[in-house]
Amino acid sequence: MDWKGRDVISIRDFSKEDIEIVLSTAERLEKELKEKGQLEYARGKILATLFFEPSTRTRLSFESAMHRLGGAVIGFAEASTSSVKKGESLADTIKTVEQYSDVIVIRHPKEGAARLAAEVAEIPVINAGDGSNQHPTQTLLDLYTIRKEFGKIDGLKIGLLGDLKYGRTVHSLAEALAYYDVELYLISPELLRMPRHIVEELREKGVTVYETSDLMSVIGELDVLYVTRIQKERFPDEQEYLKVRGSYQVNLQVLSKAKETLKVMHPLPRVDEIHPEVDKTKHAIYFKQVFNGIPVRMALLGLVLGVI
């Protein structure tokens, strides 16, 4: 696979070999970064970040990744500061921005927006989240985090907890985990179950999938608990949100029933689904997970720019 010029829109576009290339490249770049402090692979290259939706970690880690590679960054953090506010179409925005840059990272509230941007642009486009659809770079850093912690992904029992209906991070992660020999535990309120088509695809690919609303009944089985917040902004009906708000909280009492080796992950931001008392335990790796976004996004940028 020739990576130069490639778009990163959905984890579905990746083979297992593709995923392993990204993870291995990230591992190499992390080592180089620790040794040298600053790399120069992307010197003279410009990243454009187009964030039509709020972001802290994804936007800043992409910017940090590009700077660590020796490149430059332009862009906007909210649509109100762009000509979209004047009525400019997404297609015209993309065609304009690509004149100034070598790669585009886009986050947009509408599903399919990143795919549209990739169809319009002649430079690589990386999806930083499109509505409740996909978040492929988060998935890659999640896989990197799991592999880094356990030395493997195969053979693990992984629980996905919370908003499995609207959560784009868990949609992408579940699909990627189908490439590995894992057992998946899908833990959510009935109203927020994983979409049926994803569950059916997982089972067709041979993944063992358990579904439950009772966290305590499975917590002792898990190697990884991937927690997500229940996303108020994704609900079409506020009453539906109020029915499931605060469904779960991971705290010391919950973790007392877990394996000593359990690792707790979260794509962040959190609200109240993980109590702050968990932060200082050996289980919590969500801030390590945040850091891992830098080498993984460095790897993706370097690969699609053709500089590594």
Swiss-Prot record:
Belongs to the aspartate/ornithine carbamoyltransferase superfamily. ATCase family. Carbamoyl phosphate binds at R57, T58, R107, H135, Q138, L268, P269. L-aspartate binds at K86, R168, R229. SUPFAM superfamilies: Aspartate/ornithine carbamoyltransferase. It comes from Pyrococcus furiosus (strain ATCC 43587 / DSM 3638 / JCM 8422 / Vc1). Catalyzes the condensation of carbamoyl phosphate and aspartate to form carbamoyl aspartate and inorganic phosphate, the committed step in the de novo pyrimidine nucleotide biosynthesis pathway. Keywords: Pyrimidine biosynthesis, Transferase. Its EC number is 2.1.3.2. It catalyses: carbamoyl phosphate + L-aspartate = N-carbamoyl-L-aspartate + phosphate + H(+). It holds the Pfam family OTCace_N. GO terms for molecular function: amino acid binding; aspartate carbamoyltransferase activity. PANTHER family: ASPARTATE CARBAMOYLTRANSFERASE (PTHR45753:SF6), ORNITHINE CARBAMOYLTRANSFERASE, MITOCHONDRIAL (PTHR45753). Pathway: Pyrimidine metabolism; UMP biosynthesis via de novo pathway; (S)-dihydroorotate from bicarbonate: step 2/3. GO terms for biological process: 'de novo' pyrimidine nucleobase biosynthetic process; 'de novo' UMP biosynthetic process; amino acid metabolic process. The lineage of its organism: Archaea, Methanobacteriati, Methanobacteriota, Thermococci, Thermococcales. This is Aspartate carbamoyltransferase catalytic subunit. Heterooligomer of catalytic and regulatory chains.
